[in-house]
């Protein structure tokens, strides 16, 4: 029961983070990186689907479903509002790996292998945002990134509470926890003089 409560709190935190992020984007306080967000739109749905099949537990995967919907909304909303940054070559690499993971899942019917392969484009997808925020910490505000991190921390606790002797179920939320927290930490830095 407590795992369902933690999962629910994680989803609420996730949704609140998306609302805050989209408001900041409209005010020009956050600049969604086109590479990162376009890869997320393509990859998070597959990530969610493979995680559901891999873990066999929808409660563990609910945050990924919320993230998939939130990423898709944010991408198209920022695209419509003209707030996305320009694309760069990292997109192609991550998308190719994502398509490869899709093929692995389809061909071998192995969701676990596909989900582990998907962790590579997930990391790659964050790199453009990391590069942008390292250059200019004002590209992002820390709050939504820390809220997303907190949501993934709760998801890690949910996975542990619903343990099924599948340690790979932890890889995805741990990956997301550190990737999101890193953006939040870089967003808190003051801009370095040129």
Residue ranges and their predicted role:
Residues 1-194:
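Alpha-helical membrane-protein topology signature
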